[in-house]
Amino acid sequence: LEDKEKQVTVPVAEMSREDKMLARWKEKQAHLWKNLPTDPFIINASAYTAAADECGKSDGITASGIKVTEKRTLACPPAFPFGTKIAIEGMGEFRCEDRGGAIKGNKIDIYMETKSEAFSFGRRNLTAQVIQ
């Protein structure tokens, strides 16, 4: 007998606003999910804020339509669909929710609340792994 993965369906009414937004993107970006890396990989990480001089606007709304949140929001290259969860060495788990003009290849931007945090972070090569 083949084991089939059990799938849990969460009623839409119980989903958070963010999860509803990401569910819409999941359908549109379904073709990307099968090509995600399964092994750890090196990212060239930098940090950004929601300041108008960095993003062209200051409302904190990401390309996926979700409001930025520190210790959660990543700007990822287009190869990573919105909602992809990525564990980053020494930093924790994040979710791809945004894009950026310079975010291509192995570059990832980590959202931080303040410019001083972002400048202090600088640019680092870190090990990352897709966890969903």
Predicted region positions:
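Solvent-exposed, well-ordered loop and adjacent helix/strand elements within mature globular domains
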Residues: 1-132
